[in-house]
Structure formats: C-alpha cells, structure tokens
Swiss-Prot record:
Membership in a protein family: Belongs to the ProQ family.
SMART domains the record matches: ProQ
Organism: Salmonella newport (strain SL254)
GO CC annotations, alphabetized: cytosol
Record-level GO BP terms: post-transcriptional regulation of gene expression
Name listed for the protein in its UniProt record: RNA chaperone ProQ
Name of the gene encoding the protein in the UniProt record: proQ
Amino acid sequence: MENQPKLNSSKEVIAFLAERFPHCFSAEGEARPLKIGIFQDLVERVGGEMNLSKTQLRSALRLYTSSWRYLYGVKPGATRVDLDGNSCGELEEQHVEHARKQLEEAKARVQAQRAEQQAKKREAAAAAGEKEDAPRRERKPRPVARRKEGAERKPRADKPTTKAPRAPREEKHTPVSDISVLTVGQSLKVKAGNNAMDATVLEITKDGVRVQLNSGMSLIVRAEHLVF
C-alpha cells in the first residue's frame, strides 16, 4: 500500500476540506455555519484519508470556526449546512450572540496588538532622538585678535531674532469614492467636521458602511464621510 501524503498544518487541512466538501467548507470569503456534530461526520467520511487524525480534524475545525469570516457568517436568518451543503436548520439566537461576542473580542485583541506595536515604535523613535540630542564635544574658542590702540569698534548690524510662524500642516486624506473596494476588518477614518476618527470596517451594506470606532461604538456611515 502506497504512503498517502500528510497534511502538516490546520490551514492545509481546511484547504483539503474545502476541496473535498465545497458545498460546506470554503477556503476564502464568507463561510457558512456548520451543522452541530459535524466533527463526527468528518471522522466517518474522511477517516484515514491523507493520514488525517482526529486531533488534526479537531484543530482545523477550531481554527475554521474562530476565523472572522466564519463569525461574520453566523448571523440572524442564516442556516447550518452538512458536509454536502444540505440545510440543517436555522441558527439559534444564542449561537448568533455567542459568535458576535467572539468577533468583538477578536477585534479588541487586534486593536490592543496594534496599540502595543505603535507604543514600541514611539519608544524606539524617542530613544533614537535622545541619542541625536547627546552633547557634542566642546570646541575650544579661537583666540581673540588684539585691536590696535586707537582703533574704533564698528557697530554690528542687528539681525532679526524672530521668525514668521509656520502655518500648521494640514493632514491630507483620500476620500472613499467606491465602498466596493473596502473589505471587512480594514482600517480607515470617519470625518466628523474638521476631525477624522479612526475606525474599522464591520460590514458593507446597501445603506453605507458599518464601522466601529476606537471607543467601541459602531454606526453606519455613508461613503462621503469616509477617508483613508
């Protein structure tokens, strides 16, 4: 019996399942909610194929169902599917609420990681600035030439000491002309008067774009109020 190739990562297992059961799993785009108990169905249908173990299948399912694209698919009115794409009933409200909380927690973790990275960059920039501001080696003053007796000192012309203040640099933003180019999870800014607030795309609807501000508040905004 020939040795079958082995899948080494959960992503490879998901790609295999998407090819093996295209009406149930997807490798990209919004995912469909899975039937409850689908793990046992997988063990029965693909057990032994590609040298897959139960542990690999369980890890791949955990990664698949915790991804943002899967959690976005768990919404009111959606139906669960089995391995062949057959409907297995509409989602319960408690499952939709659980998925919503998981998605919010995942986004909060990403924002915390970004804030930590930005803080490290600021610390590194500050450290580099301190090195540049280190005192330089003091130069010895040149000896002053003696004036001849009777020579008069010429008055120096006064130099202007004040400089015209620079105009504050206006931050430039690129308006969002087409919301179809946006993707879920993308970072942009929402215009509010003369200010622009950081936000993250949650959903693209026919009425506009649903975004979440750094404060945690979510709202639907029209394209003319969005900039990069």
